[in-house]
């Protein structure tokens, strides 16, 4: 059974007209990725690097569609130049769901530096960040993020 937050996220994608979802495979996003992949109204696009999601999202917008990008916090660093040069300069909307690593209790020390830097880096690029501490808070953050982005 899918996590309740991912069921709600998929419902919100449909409600807000998300037609393209780019993702780098991640265990924390598996249920949402699978829901999008099974949905004939959503183009689910597996990416080889997170940076591709910025171009995918921007291209979808230019083509008249809304997109979402899904990734783990360790991949956010790969998106910095694309966000700064494409999204910020062209004022394209950007909606991302980023699962966090490197937080309290992280067992992999390699995840800690980017996990701690993710929100400040995104904010420094002008990206509005909604941080979620519990699954129950995810739907509200996703809904607000979609409204702000589009």
Give, region by region, the residue ranges found by the protein language model.
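Thiamine diphosphate
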Residues: 1-150
């Amino acid at each position: 059974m899918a996590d309740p937050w991912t069921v709600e996220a998929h419902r919100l994608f449909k409600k807000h007209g998300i037609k393209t979802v780019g993702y780098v495979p991640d265990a924390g996003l598996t249920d949402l990725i699978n829901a999008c992949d099974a949905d004939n109204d959503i183009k689910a696009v597996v990416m080889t690097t997170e940076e591709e999601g910025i171009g995918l999202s921007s291209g979808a917008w230019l083509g008249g569609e809304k997109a979402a990008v899904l990734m783990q916090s360790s991949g956010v660093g790969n998106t910095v130049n694309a966000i700064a040069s494409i999204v910020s300069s062209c004022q394209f909307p950007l909606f991302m769901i980023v699962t966090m690593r490197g937080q309290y209790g992280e067992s992999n020390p390699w995840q800690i530096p980017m996990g701690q830097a993710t929100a400040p880096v995104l904010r420094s690029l002008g990206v509005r960040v909604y941080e979620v501490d519990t699954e129950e808070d995810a739907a509200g953050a996703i809904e607000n993020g979609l409204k702000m982005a589009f």
